[in-house]
Amino acid sequence: MIFQASFYKSKKLLLIEDCEPVRASIKGMLQQIGFDDITAVADAMQAVSPAKRHSFDFILADFNLGDGKDALQLFNELSALGAIKTACCFVLMSTEPQRLPVFGVLQGTPDHFVLKPFSYVELEKRLAKAWQNRTALRKVYQAIKQTDLASALLELDEAIKAGSANALQALRLKGELLLAQGEYNAAAQLYSKIQQQRDFSWARLGAAVTMVKLQQWADAEQALLQLAEQDDIRPEAVEWLARCYLLQADLVKAQEQLTELLKLQPTHIAAHYALADVLQLNGQQEDSSRYLQKLIQQFRFSAFDAPECYLQLSRVLLEQAQHAELGAFTAALKKSSEALASMPQKLTTDVIEPELAVLRARISLLQGNVADAKQQLNLITVATKPVHVAAEQDKARLAFALGDTKQAEAHLAVLKSADFAADDLSGCCQRLLAKQAVLRETELRAQLRDLNQAGMDAVQKGNVKVALVKLRQAFLLMPCNAGLALNLLQVLSQLPAHKALLPLAKAVLSALENTSVTSANQQRLAQLLPQLPELYLD
């Protein structure tokens, strides 16, 4: 053994293995090595709680963890939660060779890999090697954790100059640190120098990423397309191609690369969300709706189940309902409500609940419950920065629909000034969605004026049915605009009573009842009410 049993006796280890007999066997090996403090769990979901509670020195995880997240996804989740301490060694094990990420060591990657079956001697060698590597660069990792990148670079330069066994890892870290600091030219020079000595895949990818950062789009595309032909680096290259195209707003090519990425990594959740966003950005609402429904069915009640799918599906269905014909409106609106209701209770966190409440209020308003929607609007605060573009747009839409254009503009101002600096898939999509949201809200106001004008022109020409279609569309965009509501009420008073029009008439009357109206509008309402069919006034 490389280390004595006494070394391991003081260390805490988390073992994650879904097969009970294998888990027991590996635990026995670990005890033979010298570990006393061993926490053994069966899957990724069971691992999160102890990882958050305890400060483990080692995490030993099987790559394939049944139906839930694999070990790499668990590693990313625990890293995001801050549940992996700086000195912790994360070691993967599998019956088949697994490709570890070649880029992203700055954000963190597993320390080592051990191929099953193994003896306790082989396992100890891997654990010891991981510990030695992590310890040798502990000052670097500590500085990175404290976001002291300048100190981290100094420590890396020392390790590289010393020519230690960890010099290669130090070079990888240095390249990514330079990129993180915005030192793109320095990073390009470093990767070029490394490639002159040896053709490492990670260095070639680092050079291509540097081209993306420098917005050298043609060179970046060519380099990434070449890397995408290499098996050992294909997923990372394809993902960076998708990012490259998203940064240029080339949605067609981005969609192609995201589709290819998901063939390579079917549980790449960020890629799934990005593809759904791209479909929305492309105006493919039906495709976006179907894709979100597919994701919900595929991952429901699994470790990948997430509230974003339910929220976004509800938004897409709500927009479809607003454009539905009169006869299909109620059923379409019900689908939006059902999408929210289908979200498992465990996903309704304190962060998600405000988003849910705003969406429910938007749906409730279109059902004619103006007072409830206004009550929710009073609880909304304008964020200093958006947590999520769609959530901020929901607030703007609700405020606008209720006639509070000042608050609506405040939410749009947040989107206009938002700085989505991250160039990961989510950050790229959020940046594009924010631009589209601001543009669409501006178009919405122009559309509202056009619909109202077209409706009143149709009234003057005696084409009441056309007027109904136009003014109803305008009303659904802004129910609490007294002028619009009165125009629609005028049309309803000129049409024969019909049960199909009853919900619309009730919604218009409810909106007028809960909206401030001028004295002139009050007089107009008083004139119109006697002209309405009794069916609508019961």
Locations of regions flagged by a protein language model:
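C-terminal output helix
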Residues: 118-127
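Conserved phosphotransfer microenvironments
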Residues: 60-80, 86, 494, 501
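Conserved acidic segment of CheY-like receiver
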Residues: 9-21, 26-30
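Short hydrophobic/Thr-rich beta-strand motif most characteristic of the beta2 strand and flanking loop
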Residues: 35-43, 50
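Alpha4 helix (beta4-alpha4-beta5 surface) of REC/receiver domains from two-component response regulators
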Residues: 72-73, 86, 96-112
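CheY-like receiver
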Residues: 131-183
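Flexible loop/N-cap segments at domain edges
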Residues: 185-410, 424-432, 443-463, 491-495
